[in-house]
Swiss-Prot record:
InterPro entries: LCN-type_CS_alpha_beta_dom (IPR044062), Scorpion_toxin-like (IPR003614), Scorpion_toxin-like_sf (IPR036574), Scorpion_toxinL (IPR018218), Scorpion_toxinL/defensin (IPR002061). SUPFAM superfamilies: Scorpion toxin-like. This is Toxin Tma3. One of its GO terms (biological process) is defense response to insect. It comes from Tityus macrochirus (Scorpion).
């Protein structure tokens, strides 16, 4: 298992934006939907962060988001 930012697909490499006011709800549900233990909205970059993601789950790699792929 790993702790990291989930991405929509490995090729696109785009994190999931979130509203920092929604402390646990959206990201926690998103992460659990990807079989993680829990998740939250990281305030400094307003992106979902997951704890306990399966090792084969796509996560943020270095480089930019490619929304057009």
């Amino acid at each position: 298992k790993k702790d990291d930012y989930p991405v929509d697909t490995a090729k696109r490499n785009c994190k999931f934006p979130c509203n920092v006011i929604d402390k646990e709800g959206y990201c926690d549900n998103l992460c659990k939907g990807r079989k993680a233990e829990k998740g939250y909205c990281y305030r400094l970059n307003a992106s979902c962060y997951c704890y306990g993601l399966p090792d084969d789950s796509p996560t943020k790699k270095s480089g930019r988001c490619n929304p057009n792929l």
